[in-house]
Amino acid sequence: LQIEAKAWLDCNPEHLWIFDKLIISRLSGHICGPRGIPVPKPGEYFVKPIVNIEGMGEKARKVYVEKSTLELLHPGEFWCEVFEGEHLSIDYTKYEPTLKVIGTKHEERPYQRFTRWDKTEKWHPLPQFIGLIPLQYKTINCEFIGGKLIEIHLRGNPDFAHGNMSVIPVWKDEPDPKPDGYRFISDEGTYVERAGIYVK
């Protein structure tokens, strides 16, 4: 079972709002809204599903919007201001950061396809609105872009559970990079687009 699906099934029903990325964005103070709410001014906005159990940035994209969002977004999607900067994925245990990794992208690749992830010492604190939820789960994971919170997960980052310092994703429709000194771990039966990861 995909790790996010297991987290959804196992969580306290009162905490299901954590899976709602629009609620997280709104609570974080971001400029955002669901399909049907017009954008405040013309420009590029980030669009993605409100809930995405599959992960991997499925259907996430930048869209230029003049005003109305009805024609450009599908039901179940939301828009948000665009953030720039470092993409950090941080695991917390009882509010303390226990795993901190930074993603590297290539500008010519799709938004959701990272070139690699590496451990780092950089991190951000958990948002205050999360309250006592971290006390009820073994690990909480948060993702930030440029210091702005974009997602919360009621589980840890599975890609760094192998004693590794770095991860290189392998995508099914792209050439296998076969990096020297890394070992391959298959994603078979887990992710649709990703074939697996190289770890070191």
Name each model feature, range by range.
Residues 56, 108-200:
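ATP-dependent carboxylate activation and anion-phosphoryl transfer catalytic cores
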